[in-house]
C-alpha cells in the first residue's frame, strides 16, 4: 500500500498538470499559437538544460559500474529494435516515429531518483541508469523522429544530409553532449550557476505538460486506440516482463534492480510529445500514450516493485 501511495503521489500530479493545460485552453487562457510557442520554448531551452543538469551533476568516475551501464545500454537498444519492428505492423504508418519513441522512452531520470531515494534514502545506482539510458533515449528519439517523419519519403542523399544535420544541431543532443563533457572534465558548479540552471530546468516538465494538455484533442489522441493500447502495454508491461527476469538472473538487486525496473516500466515521458511536435509530427498519438501510461503506471510500477520486494530482491 505504501508503494502504491508513493507511486500515486508521483504520477497523479503529472496527470493533473497535463489536464490543467487542457482546462486553460478550454477557458481561453491558452490558444493554439501560445501553446505552439510554449512547446518550441520547452524544446529549445528548458529541456536541453534539464538533461545537461541531470548528466553534468553525476560524478561518472565515482559512480561507474561497467556491468550495470552495459546491461542498461543493451536492453535499451534491444527495446528500441523491438519497437521499430513492431511499428512495421502499423497501417497507415504515419505514426511509426511516435509509436517507436513512446513505447521505449521512460520518465527514467526524474522518477528513478525519486523512487530510489524514497526506498533507500539516497540516489543509489540511479545516476548510472541515467548515464546508460537517457543519452541513448534522446539520441535514438532524434534519429527515429527524423527517419520516420510522415512526409519523409525515401532516404536519398538530400534527405539523409538534412536528417544528419537535424540530429547534430538538435538542442536535446547538444544538452547531452554539454552535460557529458562537464561531468567528464569535473568542472565545478558554482552556487549561482547551479541555482540559475536548476530554476530553468525545473520549468521543463510543468511547461511541457501544460503545453501537451493545451494541445490535447481527445478524439485525435485516441483515434488510433489499438496502437495506443499496444504502445502502452509494451511500455508498462512488455519490456518489463521480457527483461526483468534477465536482470535478476544477472545478479542485480536492491537499488540497481529498482533502477532497471524504473527504466523499463515507468510512464512515457512528456518529452515524447515535445520532441514529436517540434520535429514534424502531429504529436496527438504521443500525447495519448503519455496520458495512458501516466494513468496506469502507478499500478503497474507498484506491482513490479511489490513482486521484487516479495522475492527479497529489493
Description of each model-found segment:
Residues 1-314:
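Alpha-helical transmembrane segments of multi-pass small-molecule/ion transporters
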Amino acid at each position: 500500500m505504501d508503494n502504491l501511495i508513493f507511486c500515486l503521489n508521483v504520477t497523479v500530479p503529472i496527470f493533473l498538470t497535463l489536464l490543467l493545460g487542457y482546462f486553460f485552453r478550454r477557458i481561453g487562457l491558452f490558444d493554439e499559437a501560445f501553446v505552439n510557442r510554449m512547446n518550441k520554448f520547452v524544446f529549445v531551452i528548458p529541456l536541453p538544460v534539464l538533461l545537461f543538469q541531470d548528466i553534468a551533476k553525476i560524478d561518472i568516475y565515482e559512480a561507474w559500474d561497467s556491468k550495470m551501464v552495459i546491461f542498461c545500454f543493451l536492453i535499451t537498444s534491444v527495446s528500441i529494435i523491438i519497437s521499430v519492428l513492431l511499428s512495421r505492423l502499423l497501417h497507415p504508418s504515419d505514426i511509426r516515429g511516435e509509436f517507436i519513441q513512446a513505447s521505449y522512452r521512460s520518465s527514467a531520470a526524474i522518477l528513478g531518483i525519486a523512487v530510489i531515494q524514497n526506498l533507500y534514502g539516497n540516489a543509489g545506482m540511479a545516476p548510472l541508469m541515467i548515464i546508460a539510458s537517457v543519452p541513448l533515449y534522446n539520441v535514438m528519439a532524434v534519429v527515429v523522429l527524423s527517419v520516420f517523419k510522415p512526409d519523409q519519403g525515401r532516404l536519398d542523399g538530400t534527405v539523409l544530409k538534412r536528417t544528419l544535420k537535424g540530429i547534430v544541431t538538435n538542442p536535446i543532443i547538444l544538452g547531452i553532449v554539454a552535460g557529458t563533457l562537464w561531468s567528464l572534465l569535473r568542472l565545478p558548479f558554482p552556487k549561482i550557476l547551479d541555482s540559475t540552471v536548476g530554476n530553468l530546468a525545473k520549468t521543463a516538465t510543468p511547461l511541457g505538460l501544460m503545453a501537451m494538455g493545451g494541445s490535447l484533442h481527445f478524439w485525435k489522441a485516441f483515434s488510433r486506440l489499438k496502437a495506443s493500447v499496444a504502445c502502452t502495454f509494451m511500455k508498462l508491461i512488455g519490456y518489463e516482463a521480457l527483461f526483468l527476469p534477465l536482470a535478476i538472473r544477472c545478479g542485480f538487486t536492491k537499488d540497481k534492480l529498482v533502477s532497471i525496473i524504473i527504466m523499463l516500466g515507468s510512464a512515457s515521458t512528456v518529452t515524447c510529445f515535445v520532441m514529436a511536435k517540434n520535429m514534424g509530427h502531429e504529436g496527438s498519438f504521443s500525447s495519448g500514450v503519455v496520458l495512458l501510461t501516466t494513468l496506469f503506471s502507478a499500478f503497474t510500477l507498484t506491482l513490479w516493485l511489490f513482486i521484487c520486494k516479495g522475492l527479497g530482491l529489493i
